[in-house]
Regions:
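Gly/Pro/Ser/Thr-rich low-complexity, intrinsically disordered segments predominantly at protein N-termini
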Residues: 1-162
Length: 162
């Protein structure tokens, strides 16, 4: 069974599979409250004045990175994926990702995810913990701790309210 078949099978079983630098991470599917936070944040994504990025977002889709397979809660791209790629695991690297922390998976989202994403070419990583209202904004050489609600301007000239 190849990785794409394993991913599809894991969805049928109600779990998410992610691979980070060779380490397989299994996670339960997100719950209602989690998804409401994701939808609220996604609805706030917009283009900053003077930006040329289309600020296209995708929710909960698999992305094949050079060193792993992740399924960010929100991925932000400057353009739509190509037509051929829209029916399979995406391979284009997002400009930014947003993760909403699920209870019990704090380490995955706060400690494992940000350095992995940055190492794969993602420019901005936002992690929101709804329990504490912490918003962690990580980019190359910088990590900021903010408190929700907050407007964050991304390097790609998009903005998002977390």
């Amino acid at each position: 069974m190849d990785l794409q078949q394993l991913v599809l099978r894991s969805d049928e079983l109600g779990v998410r599979l992610e691979v980070v630098n060779g380490l397989a991470i299994w996670e339960a599917q997100p719950l209602y409250r989690h998804q409401k936070h994701v939808e609220r944040i996604a609805a706030s994504i917009g283009r900053l004045e003077g930006g040329n990025c289309d600020c296209v977002h995708a929710l909960d889709v698999y992305i094949q990175f050079p060193n792993g397979l992740k399924r960010p809660d929100i991925s932000i791209f400057c353009r739509e994926p190509g037509e051929a790629e829209q029916d399979s695991v995406l391979t284009m690297v997002p400009e930014a990702v947003v993760e909403v922390v699920s209870k019990g998976y704090e380490a995955k989202d706060l400690e494992i995810g940000p350095p992995f994403y940055l190492s794969q070419g993602v420019k901005d990583v936002l992690v929101f913990d709804p329990q504490t209202l912490l918003v962690l904004h990580v980019c190359q050489g910088q990590a900021r701790r903010l408190v929700s609600p907050v407007v964050v301007d991304l390097k790609c000239r998009c903005s998002v309210v977390v």
